[in-house]
Each structure stands twice: as structure tokens, then as C-alpha cells.
Amino acid sequence: MKVFIPKLDQFVREDHPYRKILELVDFKELTQALQEEYSSRGRGGYPVDTGFKCLLLQYTEDLSDRELERFLQENLAGKLFCGFGLDETTPDFSYFSVLRKRIGTSHLADFFNPVRESLKEGGMIREIIT
């Protein structure tokens, strides 16, 4: 007997905004400097680009750490965006504060600004001066 395990990709519509962001932003390249600071020793954790995408969702969706934990458990588009599978465990709330400390709150803008520029170039956002 074969067990069919569906792919997360099947449950998120093709025109979802998170998919467009993934097309426009090279998160691996963006987080390369952070990756170099991670040790290759010890138990492996979540990939750096995955953690950064979680923080980006937290910012754009205006979520607390605990709300982000639940969002990633329940929201299929959020799981897809961050790179989690249907059956993968997502981080708990404490992971996000540790990651922010590791990056440094003042340096988050250094990573968010290139994302903003890519989204502007891709036509997803625009600046309105009033």
C-alpha cells in the first residue's frame, strides 16, 4: 500500500504574494554574510535564510514572536515562503528573539532594505510621498 503525501506547493495558489517575493528576492545571497558567522559544529539548526524569512513575515504581518510561531504552524503560505514542508516542525517563539539578537536589531534594516528595493523594482510596493 502506498501512502500519498501531498506537497505544500499544491495548497498555495500560484498568484500568492509570497510566491512573488520568493521570485524577486535572492534570500540565500542576501543572508550569505550571516551564514558565514554560523558555526558548522554542533547540532544543525534552521537555515539562516529560513530564519530571516520568518523575521520578514513577522515584520510584514505585524506579529509577536508567539503569534509568528502559531502563524507558521497554521498558515500554509507562510510555511511555503519560509521553506518548511507540510510535516516539518517550525520554530518556537524563543528562536526568533535569539535570531534577532544574533543579527543585531540595528542591523536588521541592512537586510530589510535590499528586500524593499527588490520589491519596488518588481512592482510589488511603491513609495508614496505626502
Provide a role label for each language-model segment.
Residues 1-25:
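Charged, often Cys/His-bearing segments associated with DNA-binding zinc-finger transcription factors
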Residues 29-43:
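Short, Lys/Arg-enriched N-terminal segment that forms or immediately precedes the first helix
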Residues 39, 73-74, 116-117:
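Short amphipathic alpha-helical surface patches that mediate protein-protein
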Residues 43-49, 88:
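Secondary-structure capping and boundary motifs in well-ordered enzyme cores
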Residues 52-62:
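Alpha-helical support elements that line or immediately flank enzyme active sites
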Residues 67-80:
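DNA-recognition alpha helix
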Residues 86-130:
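Active-site- or DNA-interface-adjacent structural scaffold in DNA-acting proteins
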